Amino acid sequence: MRIYDGSPRQNYEEVLRSVGAFLDQRGMREVMVVEAPDGFVVQGIVVENSTSGAWSEHLGQQTKDTFTFLDDDIARFMEEGHARRDNEQRAVTWGQAGYYEQAFRVVGRYVDEQKPADIFFFEQDGAFVLRLLMRPQTGRRHVIAEFTREEVEAMIAQARDFRGERTKTQPGA
């Protein structure tokens, strides 16, 4: 993975978090992420609403979208995420962040701990399957890791405490 300005050597946690925030905004689900030499390829299902008929019937059509995020796109997503979280009026607390922003962040944390050469993963119904290309002294090899939806949700619940963050008190709460 490319080193982004101001980031540690490998920072899948922050990179994947920013990609996840984009996917949340897009309403994407059942996603696949492949790391490429110059960024990431992301594919998933989106439900697009369309209006048709005399009675304006709302029909949702599922489409499969594919995005190629180059290094510059990733850097921009990260900057936008930092700006959003640093802006007190627009700040999104951890509990308000979308599912993919949270899930990709904790999966990214796991990936950072493994220190792979590159990654591939897919998500379906909240469960993740990862294939990491490792660089042990005996030669490169792929390692598979799986996380159930419940495991990912537990990782999300623990993430705030792990980083020393606490849920911000909401006004009127």
What does each model-found stretch correspond to?
Residues S18-T51, F104-P136:
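Amphipathic, interaction-prone secondary-structure segments
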Residues I45-E88, F128-T169:
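Intrinsically disordered, low-complexity regulatory segments enriched in Ser/Thr/Pro
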Residues M1-E30, D71-I74, E79-Q114, A157, ...:
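Negatively charged, low-complexity tracts enriched in Asp/Glu with abundant Ser/Thr
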